[in-house]
Swiss-Prot record:
Active site as annotated: 12, 198
Record function comment: Catalyzes the irreversible cleavage of the glycosidic bond in both 5'-methylthioadenosine (MTA) and S-adenosylhomocysteine (SAH/AdoHcy) to adenine and the corresponding thioribose, 5'-methylthioribose and S-ribosylhomocysteine, respectively. Also cleaves 5'-deoxyadenosine, a toxic by-product of radical S-adenosylmethionine (SAM) enzymes, into 5-deoxyribose and adenine.
Protein name: 5'-methylthioadenosine/S-adenosylhomocysteine nucleosidase
Lineage, broadest ranks: Bacteria, Pseudomonadati, Pseudomonadota, Gammaproteobacteria, Vibrionales
Listed EC numbers: 3.2.2.9
Catalytic activity annotation: S-adenosyl-L-homocysteine + H2O = S-(5-deoxy-D-ribos-5-yl)-L-homocysteine + adenine; S-methyl-5'-thioadenosine + H2O = 5-(methylsulfanyl)-D-ribose + adenine; 5'-deoxyadenosine + H2O = 5-deoxy-D-ribose + adenine
Organism name: Vibrio vulnificus (strain YJ016)
């Protein structure tokens, strides 16, 4: 069994990379691939770069050349669910693009031509994430829709647009839908497990940059627990 793990930024993959043994590094097309083992599980850790195009390029190479049995997307996200606070975890049930609009041709908002409106996370991987969560004392998590776009959502106007068109959204970020769409086309199961680095409509004394290392720690701990359960 081989697990693909994807994070966009160096900060989001650093803790996982440090835990790897027998690691080999390959740089290709602006992406960095670390192959080795974590806690006895064979993994390929991808640092894709930020945004949907970078994520799609990296995921395509990951699936085509390394052929993992599953994909875990880790890192940070912006919270939209009112119960979420900094450091909480979100687990995807489905993923959608929030910045795609071909509704003029009869598609749903967020749906790309020829693609499903939503990319459904794998049920077994969602349950695995829930089991991992049970082993993390006091870690709060919400399970639901995660939306992706090539923008850091920080204006009231964009937040309102997303809430209007995707009322069940729990979090937003910048890579997951590209990863999910690529996994869908390769028929590889995926789940998104991220930690909240900022929350819409909630003031925080910490900025995104300040909280990112803590979000990376929370999401990495979830991945570690999931890998332990896979052994």
């Amino acid at each position: 069994m081989k697990v693909g793990i994807i994070g966009a930024m160096q900060q989001e993959v650093a803790i996982l990379k440090e835990a790897m043994t027998n690691a080999q590094t390959v740089n290709k097309a602006g992406c960095t691939f670390y192959s080795g083992q974590i806690n006895g599980v064979e993994v390929v850790l991808l640092q894709s770069g930020i945004g949907k195009v970078a994520a799609a390029i990296g995921t395509t190479i990951l699936l085509d050349e390394y052929q993992p049995d599953m994909v875990l997307n880790t890192g940070s996200a912006g919270g939209f669910d009112s119960s979420l606070n900094l450091g909480d975890v979100v687990i995807s049930t489905e993923v959608r693009h929030h910045d795609a609009d071909v509704t003029a041709f009869g598609y749903e908002m967020g749906q790309m031509a020829g693609q499903p409106a939503a990319f459904l996370a794998d049920e077994k991987l969602m349950n695995l994430a829930e089991k991992a969560l049970e082993q993390m004392d006091g870690q709060h998590a919400v399970r639901g829709l995660i939306c992706t776009g090539d923008a850091f959502v920080c204006t009231a106007e964009r937040q309102a647009f997303i809430r209007q068109h995707f009322p069940s959204v729990i979090a937003v970020e910048m890579e997951a839908s590209a990863i999910a769409q690529t996994c869908h086309q390769f028929k590889v199961p995926f789940v998104v497990v991220r930690a909240i680095s900022d929350v819409a409509d909630k003031e925080s004394p910490m900025s995104f940059e300040e909280f990112l290392p803590l979000a990376a720690k929370s999401s990495s701990e979830m991945v570690f627990k999931m890998l332990e359960l896979l052994k």
